[in-house]
A protein has these predicted regions:
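Core catalytic alpha/beta fold that binds nucleotide/phospho-ligands
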Residues: 2-145
Length: 145
């Protein structure tokens, strides 16, 4: 792959120059914790924390729990990047985690989340997720372009 490769040019376009990092948030969670809450609360837990799109994605996997845990961690990380935590200003479903064209995790904010983003002078939330069979981690960054 050379520096002139069109796929590199396309990738570079997703990293705009002049973007400013405003804040970050991180969260780590044990997959077993998410699984235990799900086993106790089932649909109530899913509806309270995850959008339907997130549920559909996670339950399309042979083991949905690492994927649910990663999204749980992502929501916590996003709320921490906003310096609000989960609560009145930012709810569990204020953001939805989905995949972009290169399967990169992306954040979709609801109107409440968009208003909070704008009020903080940010234009975008970027995230990264990772998980093993036992642990999930997410980092969120508020940026202004």
């Amino acid at each position: 792959m050379s520096a002139e490769d069109p796929s590199l040019t396309e990738l570079a376009a997703t990293f705009p120059s002049g973007a400013m990092l405003l804040n970050i948030g991180v969260d780590v969670i044990e997959v077993e914790r998410v699984k235990k809450v799900y086993e106790r609360q089932k649909e109530r837990f899913l509806k309270r924390v995850f959008t339907q799109e997130e549920q559909d994605y996670c339950f399309s996997k042979s083991n949905p729990f690492p994927h649910l845990a990663a999204r749980f961690a992502a929501k916590e990380a996003v709320s921490k990047s906003f310096s609000t935590g989960i609560g009145k200003l930012f709810s569990w479903t204020s953001c939805s985690i989905y995949h972009g064209p290169r399967m990169q995790p992306l954040v979709r904010l609801d109107e409440q989340g968009k208003a909070l983003l704008k009020s903080l002078g940010a234009t975008e939330v970027r995230i990264t997720l990772s998980h093993t069979k036992t642990t999930a981690v997410a980092v969120a960054a508020l940026v202004n372009q």
